[in-house]
Amino acid sequence: MPLEKEIIKRGWEIQWFADLEDGKKALKHKTNQLNTIEQVSIYRPHVILAVTNDIPDFINALKVQIFHGFLTHKRPEKNTESHFRIRGFFDLYCTQGPSTTSVFKTLSKKLKHFEVAETGWSKVDPLFPIEKRERHSSPTVMVASTFTKRLSLAYNDAVIKKIKDLSESGLFKFIVVLHPKIPKEIIKRWENIQNNNLKYENTTDLIPLFKKTDIMLADTTSAIQEYLLQKKPVVTFRHNVKRNYLVQIEDVEDIESALNKALEYPTYLLDNINKFTMELHPYQDGQSSARVMDACIDLLTKDTSYMRAKPWNLIRKYKIRKRLGIFTLKSYNRPFKPKM
């Protein structure tokens, strides 16, 4: 993981912690993890980097939000409201690019109890530098899907048949990746159509697959934004928001022509992709993890007396204690400062 590599490179120590089942499964291979909130308290970290919406306020550490993903547009109003909701737990928000930085900085000026640093998103560090891919007579298409049934192409029988037919024709090669929460019976249907030109990949490590493919076919999956950072076109099937940086279709019959259009890499489309990604995530140096850690050190070491105390948030704090099974009156509402 890019952030872990950066932390170790600096000679610092890192421990992982998750209290929810999905997080625990993701960390099951980790030897450097804390298994209980009591262990976290004893560990006494200087910095907590979180992708979750809340964080235990009773741990005295600098609390930093690094985000789980880009702002998506599956359900625009809901996503936007959730992405920019300030819950009063964090001292620092490490934003990904101008499109989110501007909003968080406006909120910071208004609320005055957190800082904002535009760092880029550490998860995509391995994507850079962008490697130029040689074009082949049989281009490779990455198929990616979200797990919400009404938004997902993975459940669509006609889409499955079309991809199967196109792969068997030899015109395209396909690499299929489905969201891990998609039911096993749906995944099995995709596994069953595998052939020399179509492979299903059971992985959540998408960046190597991004690099192996020429274009993407997707629905509303959040992988779209990450893929576009390569300046490679994306065809979307029944995406619910119109975007000029996507090739968007509604009908299965249009899949082949849309893929061919995307493979032309039309100038107007690449221009729109570039404009979008410069707002989303302009950093292409693979150094976002370093910027995150620099921002943490900066806030740890500078005078933060100008910052207000974080809000009481009594109901949210109670819910955290109930979830973790620990009840304490401790609550640290100002940025942590290590003893020098």
Which positions does each model-derived feature cover?
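C-terminal amphipathic helix plus adjacent low-complexity
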Residues: 257, 263-340
